[in-house]
C-alpha cells in the first residue's frame, strides 16, 4: 500500500508542469525576466487567446531575446482543484542586457 501511494504521489509531482521557450535572438539575456504576467484562463483556455507585446515591454523588437510560457506546479494544482475550470498560465519576457 505504501509503495502504491508513493508511486501515485511521485507521478502527480512530475506530470503537472509544462514550459515552452521561444528564443528570438542569440544575445545574452538578463538572468531575471523583465516582466512576468499571469494569464487567467477558464475551461483549459478553450477558445481564449491572450497576447503579450514583448517589443513594448523591452523597448523595441530588437531588444527581445526570448519569451517563455509556463504552467507551474501551483497553476496545475489550481487547475486540478477546480477540475479544469480555472487554469492559469505564466508568461515571461527576457530582454537583452
Swiss-Prot record:
- Reply yes or no: does the keyword Lipoprotein apply: yes
Q: Does the keyword Cell inner membrane apply?
A: no
Where found? Host cell membrane
- InterPro entries, per the entry: Lambda_Bor
Secretion signal span: 1-16
**Main subcellular localisation:** host cell
Lipid anchor (N-palmitoyl cysteine) at which residues?
Answer: 17
Q: How does it sit in the membrane?
A: Lipid-anchor
Q: Name one GO cellular component term.
A: host cell plasma membrane
Lipid-modified residues, S-diacylglycerol cysteine kind = 17
Entry keyword set = Host cell membrane, Host membrane, Lipoprotein, Membrane, Palmitate, Signal
Main role? Not known; is expressed during lysogeny in Escherichia coli.
The UniProt entry's sequence similarity note says:
Belongs to the lambda phage bor family.
Name the UniProt record assigns to this protein: Lipoprotein bor
Organism name: Escherichia phage lambda
From the broadest rank down, the organism's phylogenetic lineage runs: Viruses, Duplodnaviria, Heunggongvirae, Uroviricota, Caudoviricetes
Which gene specifies this protein's sequence? bor
Amino acid at each position: 500500500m505504501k509503495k502504491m501511494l508513493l508511486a501515485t504521489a511521485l507521478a502527480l509531482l512530475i506530470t503537472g508542469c509544462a514550459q515552452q521557450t521561444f528564443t528570438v535572438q542569440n544575445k545574452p539575456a538578463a538572468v531575471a525576466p523583465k516582466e512576468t504576467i499571469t494569464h487567467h484562463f477558464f475551461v483549459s483556455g478553450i477558445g481564449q487567446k491572450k497576447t503579450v507585446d514583448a517589443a513594448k515591454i523591452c523597448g523595441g523588437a530588437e531588444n527581445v531575446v526570448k519569451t517563455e510560457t509556463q504552467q507551474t506546479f501551483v497553476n496545475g494544482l489550481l487547475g486540478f482543484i477546480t477540475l479544469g475550470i480555472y487554469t492559469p498560465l505564466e508568461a515571461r519576457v527576457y530582454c537583452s542586457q
